[in-house]
Amino acid sequence: MSVGHSVTSDHQLARLLQIGIVLEEVVEARAHHHYQSLAEEDRDLDDEIESLLEHAAEESAEHRNALEELIAGLEADSVPFEEIETLVEAQYGQTKPEDFDGILYDQLCNEETAYKFYDDLIKAIEDSDVEFSVDRATLLSVLRDLRAAERDGVERVTTIMEERA
């Protein structure tokens, strides 16, 4: 399921928010994978990358909590996790961490993917005239905050990459 032109029901919104949760889990898992792949001496030498990866993991956990709170307020049945995971893998999981030339490129891809997802979801909600069982203003505010955090992540990774070029 991709973010369409508009969101037409609580069920569809819940499903899209669940996709966001899985995306955040992917970002966290990939950040953890990269951190674990750093040699011990690299962990000590590159505090900036270590900090970036730690921040990405912490931010993803916070984002998942915010999305879970929104889902809890919806009048919709939960979609099985396995189904959502399959949808995310098909739509957003085309690459693996080792497909990138380094940690920073992969992290940039993760941040950009999450930003694009939230941006598309916000537009789809704004294009919808459906009344959801959660407050629309609150919903959009939370999603805009998540999008802004992802934009900041893109900028942070880009700055680090430019400084190292």
Where are these predicted regions, by residue range?
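Non-heme di-metal
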Residues: 2-165
